[in-house]
UniProtKB/Swiss-Prot annotation:
Domain of life, source organism: Eukaryota
Biased composition annotated in UniProt, kind: Polar residues: 413-428, 538-549
PANTHER family in the cross-refs: ARF-GAP WITH GTPASE, ANK REPEAT AND PH DOMAIN-CONTAINING PROTEIN 1 (PTHR45819:SF1), CENTAURIN-GAMMA-1A (PTHR45819)
Protein name per Swiss-Prot or TrEMBL: Arf-GAP with GTPase, ANK repeat and PH domain-containing protein 1
Gene designation per UniProt: agap1
Protein species of origin: Xenopus laevis (African clawed frog)
Length: 864
């Protein structure tokens, strides 16, 4: 690292410390100002908000997030007309917001890449990229609007600004063109070729066109940029060579052949313990050691200032502010029992238990307040007060754990899980969770069965059942075959951890911990293992699995939670009844967590299978085997509002038309919600062309081999100019009234034809002044999600109310159709409903008169 970079890092550290230290003095000033308020209620309300802000600041990710949780830092740049704020809002919430945020924003979201969860940090920059932004990001998304030339040119400017601060070859980039603002009055001005050229100029980055109004490619953009970051980190990690990973402790002083500065090591608490999370910060040539860099940073800047020392913390993490709420200080914990867990899920079981410390040199037992929630999480706090304040707590996710009781056999497997071996063989049977133990090699391999190992009457052995843990091995052996006369079966609770918290495999007293893979166990396996624990006997089991002597039963109220990652937690109750109640409750939560996990997998698998079958049924519709515009075989792109399939070349032309004419989506690459599948399944190419090519006589339709220009002329004439559109079925009746009738009769082809001919005003025509229902109300009353979706795409007003003030959502609730209700809520339809009752006779007469103009009584409302 050169001297200038070292100075820059030192300045950045000083600035961060100054920023961090400035927060609390300002908060304390707010507390002082609160004392001047005369209204106690307002004073307490503001104080609670300030305390919440202070707690959120103190518990930010840099102090609380596990170092095993990696981060992905994504920056998004573009001008105010680019649509970047709508893109981010759609990704985070699934909804569309048209307003652009001039100041940008900071957001967090979990994202999964290659099966691993990452904390995605999204930085929506309000202006051009600066030096601090450039050095922070792992990847950059450049956003412009396809209808705004200035936003397009701004990308070039922002890219050059970024290149001034950082080498762009080390930053993954994605270019996004947004379609949100494209409309009939605001056409597209950036064609596909110019956008592709821009992506090539930006070091050939990936280019996407998105639409935040209905989510086109939004998820793909962020998923792709996350995958690019992970791939870049892996490449950089491999290129570093022998420096595989950083030490787990930030205070570790050893360095690899390529040294890493202390600045970056101090940041590893946010990004996990792997060098791949921040390998871009490793300098190419070693220049300054960690100790030298630490010396350069003045010690005064890394310690609290005198102002901070004089000011004591006033939040609920520590003591309450004097005078802020004297009643709370006078109340004891017993008087506040009703407030336990306020604002959180009510535990299904809670109480005081003893917990053994996990520290290697200090394994005493301490009282903990333990709670078990119905979400499969067990939490323990040092005291009831800490639990009530929700501080200093630790959680155990029970999904990948098991619970053991020392001195008690694990549950015996039945024949359906593992057949019992003969008493003479003492063999280990098959089907043990896919783990295969080799008696010769000492390796643990993945298989579907465990080989039998017979050891005769003298005992059975697991051979060298070893696993690597840091730099040592641990092997287990089993003896005393007379205790296993009915066959040994390894269950989930049979594998002890190597932290000294589990007594044995299968809780047998004859399992020893050795440092060499001997088959013969030492004569006294427990001679040196439990010096730190109170004396407990673990021999001579009874049939029910409990000890047979009164001495063994004395004070034996312990249970152990063991995880798949070899972590263990020792707890002890005050009685057998309390211990068994805890064990039963924990086992039930483990079972519930496993069942919910399996249910989620089955649901996901079933959803995926159902979607694949639905898409295949779409391909099998009449005419869908060929492109709707050029007859190319096997089209795999779709236009949602047209309900037709097309080839990839025609889909590019459709994208240029704008979303107001054609909403393009990939059958294979995009998600398909149920309402979209129903629209595509209801229409198809044959029905679509019967409408859009109903008057194409005398015109030659292009074929799959036709040049792109010819296809584009045909498509624009067909959809943009509507030259081949079938004529209206009735010239005497207004188009809006025809649409109302067709919707009431659920005539899909007529609705498509009328929507293609109609304007926004005609689509929103009502049944009459005494009714004021639109076609959307009628479609919702029928529960027809296909018609509802088509009407919304063609501009029907989802906020429209009938004569009695009811929105379309009220009619959807009457029809008991959840799909229609969810669709309306997605597009912002108000969830308001007036009392629905039978229509008075006078209103019925008026409605008959109004509906007679529509051509029939099918439009007469029966509810208000």
């Amino acid at each position: 690292m050169n001297y200038q970079q070292q100075l820059a890092n030192s300045a950045a550290i000083r600035a961060e410390i100054q920023r961090f230290e400035s927060v609390h003095p300002n908060i304390y000033s707010i507390y002082e100002l609160l004392e001047r308020l005369d209204e106690p209620v307002l004073q307490n309300q503001i104080r609670e908000h300030v305390i919440a802000i202070e707690d959120a600041f103190v518990n930010s990710q840099e102090w609380t997030l596990s170092r095993s949780v990696p981060e992905l830092k994504v920056g998004i740049v573009g001008n105010l007309a680019s649509g970047k704020s709508a893109l981010v809002h759609r990704y985070l919430t699934g909804t569309y917001v048209q307003e652009e945020s001039p100041e940008g924003g900071r957001f967090k979201k979990e994202i999964v890449v290659d099966g691993q969860s990452y904390l995605l940090l999204i930085r929506d920059e309000g202006g051009p990229p600066e030096a601090q932004f450039a050095m922070w990001v792992d990847a950059v998304i450049f956003v412009f609007s396809l209808e705004d030339e200035i936003s397009f040119q701004t990308v070039y400017h922002y890219y050059s600004r970024l290149a001034n601060y950082r080498n762009t070859s080390e930053i993954p980039m994605v270019l996004v063109g947004t379609q949100d603002a494209i409309s009939g009055s605001n056409p597209r001005v950036i064609d596909d070729s110019r956008a592709r050229k821009l992506s090539n100029d930006l070091k050939r980055c990936t280019y996407y066109e998105t639409c935040a109004t209905y989510g086109l490619n939004v998820e793909r953009v962020f998923q792709d940029v996350a995958q690019k970051i992970v791939a870049t980190r892996k490449k950089q990690q491999l290129s570093i060579g022998p420096c595989k990973s950083l030490p787990n402790s930030p205070s570790h002083t050893s360095v690899c052949s390529t040294q890493v500065s202390a600045v970056h090591i101090s940041q590893t608490s946010n990004g996990g313990g792997s060098l791949s999370d921040y390998s871009s910060s490793v300098p190419s040539t070693p220049s300054t050691s960690q100790k030298e860099l630490r010396i350069d940073v003045p010690p005064a800047a890394s310690t609290p200032t005198p102002v901070r020392k004089q000011s004591k913390r006033r939040s609920n993490l520590f003591t309450s502010r004097k005078g802020s709420d004297p009643d709370k200080d006078k109340k004891g914990l017993e008087s506040r029992a009703d407030s336990i867990g306020s604002g959180r899920a009510i535990p299904i079981k809670q109480g005081m238990l003893l917990k053994r410390s996990g520290k290697s040199l200090n394994k005493e037992w301490k009282k903990k307040y333990v709670t078990l929630s119905d979400n499969g999480v067990l939490t323990y706090h040092p005291s009831l007060h800490d639990y009530m304040q929700n501080v200093h707590g630790k959680e155990i996710d029970l999904l990948r754990t098991t619970v053991k009781v020392p001195g008690k056999r694990p549950p015996r497997a039945t024949s359906s899980c593992a057949p019992v071996a003969s008493p003479k063989t003492n063999g280990l049977t098959k089907e043990v969770s896919g783990l295969q133990i080799s008696p010769n090699t000492g390796n643990v391999t993945s298989s579907t069965s465990v080989t039998q190992m017979a050891s005769g009457p003298s005992g059975i052995s697991l051979g060298s059942f070893s696993r690597m843990d840091g730099m040592h091995q641990r092997s287990y052996s089993v003896s005393s075959a007379d205790q296993w006369s009915e066959g040994a079966v390894i269950t989930n609770s049979a594998i002890s951890s190597d932290t000294g918290l589990g007594d044995s495999v299968c809780s047998s007293p004859s399992i020893s911990s050795t440092t060499s893979p001997k088959l013969d166990p030492p004569p006294s396996p427990h001679a040196n293992r439990k010096k730190h624990r109170r004396k407990k006997s673990t021999s001579n089991f009874k049939v029910d699995g409990l000890s047979s002597t009164a001495e063994e039963q004395e004070e034996n109220f312990e249970f152990i939670i063991v995880s798949l990652t070899s972590q263990s937690w020792h707890f002890e109750a005050t009685s057998y009844e309390e211990r068994d109640a805890w064990v039963q409750a924990i086992e039930s939560q483990i079972l519930a967590s496993l069942q919910s996990c399996e249910s989620s997998k089955n649901k996901s698998r079933l959803t995926s299978q159902n979607e694949a079958l639905a898409l295949q049924s779409i391909r099998n519709l009449p005419g869908n085997s060929h492109c709707v515009d050029c007859d190319a075989q096997s089209p795999d792109w779709a236009s949602l509002n047209l309900g037709a399939l097309m080839c990839i070349e025609c889909s590019g032309i459709h994208r240029n038309l704008g979303t107001h004419l054609s909403r393009v989506r990939s059958l294979d690459l995009d998600d398909w919600p149920p309402e979209l599948i129903k629209v595509m399944s209801a229409i198809g190419n044959e029905l679509a062309n019967s409408v859009w090519e109903g008057s194409s006589q005398g015109h030659v339709k292009p074929c799959s081999e036709s040049p792109r220009e010819e296809k584009e002329r045909w498509i624009r004439a067909k959809y943009e100019q509507r030259l081949f559109l079938s004529p209206l079925p009735c010239r005497d009746l207004p188009l809006g009234q025809q649409l109302l009738r067709a919707t009431a009769e659920e005539d899909l082809r007529a609705v498509i034809l009328l929507l293609a001919h109609g304007s926004r005003e005609e689509v929103n025509e009502t049944c009459g002044e005494g009714d004021r229902r639109t076609s959307l109300h009628l479609a919702c009353r029928k529960g027809n999600v296909v018609l509802v979706q088509l009407l919304i795409w063609y501009g029907v007003d989802v906020m429209a109310r009938d004569f009695h003030g009811n929105t379309a959502l009220a009619y959807a609730k009457q029809a008991v159709t959840s799909e229609v209700r969810e669709l309306l809520l997605q597009y912002g339809c108000p969830d308001e409903q007036f009392v629905l009752m039978a229509t008075p006779n006078l209103s019925r007469k008026n409605n008959r008169n109004n509906n007679s103009n529509a051509g029939g009584s099918g439009l007469m409302p029966t509810l208000i």
